[in-house]
């Protein structure tokens, strides 16, 4: 096991599953969460900003993690949100979220803040994206010299072989679909694509918050208000996923899956424990707004797994390991929570 923590920047659009990514970033012992940027996506950007600050307040991390407002809209098209899945606020389903006790930082732009974090952790920092890729693509478009200084870019997005939840043919995943132009900017960049890790729906659909998972989160012995908050978020998420996408056993908790490969690749835990299986591919997506398959992932080329070329596309994971990391982080968060 490595001694040093893994420096990460999280760009997210909270979002029920983003909430768990924030929990892991804050409280998993492996991660040093340097900052959060919030983008449009699951809800309008003013909501995702508020939600991130509310979650950090609830977890006792107010002002400990700087929050910046990231990309506010897609590069070329009109924004789309997901109230049918996440509710109007982006975090519907609980009344336990507190009013944030701090504001988003305005001392610098999100581009400057991310630049500063990358340069301070040159060659070691990883960027985790659990929403649209607009924030990161904008950073690299404005400051392309930063590309060489990021170790990994871990992305929750896309679906292989036409698996999706958006567009008329349901062949695109939401995060890619809402800004495929920004996604292609990352996927097609020869300086970036080989350090990208993509966890697609094909993998995240295995990370189901079942009834048994809910019992581990909140039970007679572990019944804090913070745990109740996460239980209520999961229960709301379960209802919307059952109603809108037919998930009977519970909702898929997509976003925190993007953090798991980093635990293996930085040497925090062995591959035998993490169980991350992947293929290396060059990918792109259909970015024509008028195409019925807009946002669909296209596999351009496949490489041998032992190659250092091609985007790392996740296929499988030790799901028990995944939940164990979340339970450990929640145990730690319990001790700092401001809501009981």
From Swiss-Prot:
Optimum pH is 7.0-7.2. It holds the Pfam family IU_nuc_hydro. One of its GO terms (molecular function) is nicotinamide riboside hydrolase activity. It is found in: Cytoplasm; Nucleus. One of its GO terms (biological process) is pyrimidine nucleoside catabolic process. InterPro entries: I/U_nuclsd_hydro_CS, Inosine/uridine_hydrolase_dom, IUNH, Ribo_hydro-like. Belongs to the IUNH family. This is Uridine nucleosidase.
């Amino acid at each position: 096991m490595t001694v040093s923590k893994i420096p990460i920047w999280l760009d997210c659009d909270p979002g029920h599953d983003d909430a768990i990514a924030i929990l892991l970033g804050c409280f998993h012992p492996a991660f040093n969460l340097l900052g959060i940027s919030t983008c449009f996506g699951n809800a309008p950007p003013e909501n995702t900003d508020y939600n991130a600050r509310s979650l950090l307040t609830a977890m006792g991390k107010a002002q400990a993690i700087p929050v910046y407002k990231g990309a506010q809209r897609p590069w070329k098209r009109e924004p789309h949100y997901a109230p049918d899945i996440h509710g109007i606020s982006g975090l519907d389903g609980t009344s336990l979220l507190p009013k944030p006790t701090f504001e988003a930082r305005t001392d610098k732009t999100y581009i400057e803040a991310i630049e500063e974090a990358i340069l301070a952790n040159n060659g070691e920092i990883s960027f985790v994206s659990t929403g649209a890729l607009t924030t990161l693509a904008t950073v690299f478009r404005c400051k392309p010299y930063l590309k060489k200084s990021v170790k990994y870019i871990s992305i929750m997005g896309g679906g292989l072989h036409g698996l999706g939840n958006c567009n008329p043919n349901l062949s695109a995943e939401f995060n890619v679909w809402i800004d495929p132009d920004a996604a292609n900017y990352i996927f097609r960049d020869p300086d970036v694509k080989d350090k990208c890790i993509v966890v697609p729906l094909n993998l995240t659909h295995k990370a189901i918050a079942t009834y048994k998972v809910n019992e581990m989160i909140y039970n007679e012995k572990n019944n804090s208000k913070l745990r109740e908050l996460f239980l209520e978020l999961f229960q709301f998420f379960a209802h919307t996923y059952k109603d809108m996408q037919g998930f009977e056993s519970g909702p898929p908790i997509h976003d925190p899956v993007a953090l798991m490969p980093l635990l293996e690749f930085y040497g925090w835990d062995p591959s035998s424990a993490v169980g991350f299986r992947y293929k290396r591919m060059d990918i792109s997506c259909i970015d024509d707004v008028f195409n019925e398959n807009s946002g669909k992932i296209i596999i351009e080329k496949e490489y041998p797994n032992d190659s250092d070329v091609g985007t790392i596309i996740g296929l499988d994971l030790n799901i028990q390991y995944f939940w164990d990391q979340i339970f450990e982080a929640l145990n730690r968060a319990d001790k700092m929570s401001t809501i009981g």
